[in-house]
Regions:
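Non-catalytic alpha-helical scaffolds and adjoining flexible linkers that form interface surfaces
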Residues: 1-212
Length: 212
């Protein structure tokens, strides 16, 4: 945001590093590059750099938000979900868990969240298992499901529902059992990719079956 900041790192200290929440001020004139005049640290997520997977997922979350919400202007709630994800990574939550939580929350926030309320055929809200049809973003219950779709337990569906209904203050408090996390890992990234058809550079060297 400011050419002066790059020439004056001593002036702004370590506040220009990644993984800090800043309070910044700048001056702006028509047709000219904005000039950063002050930057102070409000919160640090620097513990992220202690682990490479945390770094990759932190960069992925920032890339994800900018990709899903590219329009100019404030994106207050999307930014709050991003901060919640960075905070969880900094506190040591497994990166894969943070990734799935943030993906589900942001998809719902942007209006792309799937309809997980009930079976698409019979309307049954509960079943021992469901199949999720990625192309439709809907569920089929155990009785109605054919061979298509991705098999999900009721626990996985309930967890995904909770993530879609979460707020920035509550999403980090949702605990995902390992077995459920594996199920969500098999479906949420696929649904995200189906909706947007983009690859994310931050996780570019992960095997194709595991992205993002």
């Amino acid at each position: 945001v400011a050419k002066a900041a790059r020439r004056s790192r001593k002036r702004f200290g370590g506040s220009l590093q990644k993984y800090f929440l800043l309070d910044v001020s700048w001056t702006e004139e028509p047709g000219r590059i904005p000039i950063l005049t002050s930057a102070s640290i409000l919160a640090s997520f620097w513990d992220i750099v202690a682990d490479w997977e945390r770094v990759r997922y932190a960069d992925y979350l920032m890339e994800l938000v900018s990709s899903l919400f590219p329009q100019p202007g404030a994106k207050t709630k999307a930014f709050a979900f991003l901060l919640a994800g960075l905070r969880s990574l900094s506190l040591g939550e497994p990166p894969v868990s943070v990734g799935r939580k943030t993906e589900a929350a942001l998809l719902a926030l942007g209006g792309w969240g799937p309809d997980l309320s009930a079976c698409r055929k019979c309307g049954r809200p509960e079943s021992r298992s469901f199949r999720f049809v990625v192309a439709e973003g809907r569920l089929s219950c155990e009785a109605c499901a054919g061979r298509g779709g991705i098999l999900l337990s009721l626990g996985a569906v309930r967890t995904w529902r909770a993530l879609q209904a979460s707020s920035p203050p509550t999403v980090g408090r949702i605990r995902i059992p390992e077995s459920v996390l594996m199920e969500l890992q098999s479906v949420i990234p696929k649904y995200l990719m189906w909706n947007f058809g983009v690859s994310f550079k931050s996780l570019g060297d992960i095997p194709a079956g595991e992205k993002p």
